[in-house]
Amino acid sequence: MRAVVIEQFGLRPEVRDLPAPSAPPGGVVLDVEATGVCRSDHHAFAGHDDTVTLPRVPGHEMVGRVAALGEGVTSVRVGERVTTPFVEGCGRCRWCRQGAAQICPDQTQPGFTHDGSWAEQVAIRAADHNLVPVGEDLPAEAVVTLGCRFATAYRALTARAGLRAGETVAVIGCGG
């Protein structure tokens, strides 16, 4: 499998051939259709995030098709088109059950805690909790923005600001 790999902080990533990932128990392997490039990726390979270990395949914004199912996965089928949030909760703890996976003590983050989506394939853990089906009519370049940027904005507007259906919001600026 071809992948972009960061071997050393601050150096240019390189394209390498790596072994294909295996589906972990409760997880899946995705064939990556498209992946995003985010400011967080820059911080990871610049060495600004002390949780990132090297070598690492970056990438946390993705859309792809389920290529393999791990033991116990029930919510998706092989071939299904999906995306995933940047912060992937365990799906079992009280935070995940309350919809707050971003504070899950056992969260994972593709491209940070394990190899990410700048590859032909990526392993996703806790698939039944983290995968979101994506319609065939949605363009991949739009879908890759959903897992990080959209999810961040959506939670800020709904959970923090209390915005409800029918209300109006003005977006003054955006960036990363």
Feature roles, as predicted:
Residues 19-35, 48-94, 135-138:
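Glycine-rich beta-strand-centered segment in the early N-terminal region that forms part
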Residues 8, 71, 98:
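Short, conserved catalytic or interaction motifs in soluble domains
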Residues 175:
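Conserved glycine-rich cofactor-binding loop
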Residues 10-15, 39-40:
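Short N-terminal binding/cap micro-motifs at the start of the first secondary-structure element
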Residues 90-172:
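NAD(P)H dinucleotide-binding glycine-rich loop of Rossmann-like/cofactor-binding domains
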Residues 40-46:
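Cytochrome P450 core scaffold surrounding the K-helix E-X-X-R motif
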